[in-house]
């Protein structure tokens, strides 16, 4: 493993243990050149979850993109940022398929937001469902109100 401090090509493993989440191995390493220590994480390389876009093309799932959408919807709302992060970064692990349609990601995000905050839910729905009129927006709010 290349040293991040001096770029020497060799290091030795000083300590190795499972990470807190159990999904990776945490290794403490020591550079054989400069003797500085650093931490690396080893994780299994899985096939990426592919997202089928509305227009047809496929792209690898990006949890940061989902997190950005959730963060925008919850901006200035009393929603725990750690909950958003956990949902976005745990999303790929929860999907038991190699492909998912972008519409399904939106549905699952709305299901996640619904019990957390009504305003965030409506904000996300307005983008996800692509409201084209005020009437459509009002319909969604009425539906939300009826479910409460």
Curated annotation (Swiss-Prot):
The coenzyme or cofactor needed here is: Zn(2+)
What role is this protein assigned?
Negatively regulates transcription of bacterial ribonucleotide reductase nrd genes and operons by binding to NrdR-boxes.
The ranges of region (Disordered) come to 1-22
Q: Which InterPro entries match?
A: ATP-cone_dom, NrdR-like_N, RNR_NrdR-like
PROSITE patterns xrefs: ATP_CONE
The protein's matches in Pfam families, at most eight in alphabetical order, are given as: ATP-cone, Zn_ribbon_NrdR
Care to name a GO molecular-function term for this sequence? ATP binding
Zinc finger (unnamed) stretch: 3-34
Q: PANTHER family of this UniProt entry? A: TRANSCRIPTIONAL REPRESSOR NRDR (PTHR30455:SF2)
Name-wise, this protein is: Transcriptional repressor NrdR
Instruction: Work out whether the entry's keyword set contains ATP-binding.
Output: yes
Task: Report the record's Gene Ontology biological process terms.
Answer: negative regulation of DNA-templated transcription
The UniProt similarity line reads: Belongs to the NrdR family.
The cofactor binding remark recorded in the entry reads: Binds 1 zinc ion.
**Keyword field contains Translocase:** no
Which segments constitute the ATP-cone domain? 49-136
- This protein's UniProt keywords: ATP-binding, DNA-binding, Metal-binding, Nucleotide-binding, Repressor, Transcription, Transcription regulation, Zinc, Zinc-finger
Q: Which gene encodes it?
A: nrdR
């Amino acid at each position: 493993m290349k040293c991040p401090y001096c770029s020497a090509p060799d290091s030795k493993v000083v300590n190795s243990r499972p990470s807190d989440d159990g999904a990776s191995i945490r290794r403490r390493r020591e550079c054989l050149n400069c003797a500085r220590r650093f931490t690396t994480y080893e994780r299994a390389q899985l096939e990426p979850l592919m997202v089928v876009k509305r227009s047809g093309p496929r792209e690898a799932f990006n949890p940061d993109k989902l997190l950005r959408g959730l963060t925008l919807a919850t901006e200035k709302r009393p929603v725990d940022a750690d909950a958003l992060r956990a949902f976005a970064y745990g999303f790929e692990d929860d999907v038991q398929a190699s492909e998912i349609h972008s519409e399904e990601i939106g549905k699952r995000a709305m299901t996640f937001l619904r019990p957390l905050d009504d305003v965030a839910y409506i904000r996300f729905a307005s983008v996800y469902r692509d409201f084209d009129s005020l009437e459509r927006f009002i319909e969604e709010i009425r539906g939300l109100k009826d479910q409460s």
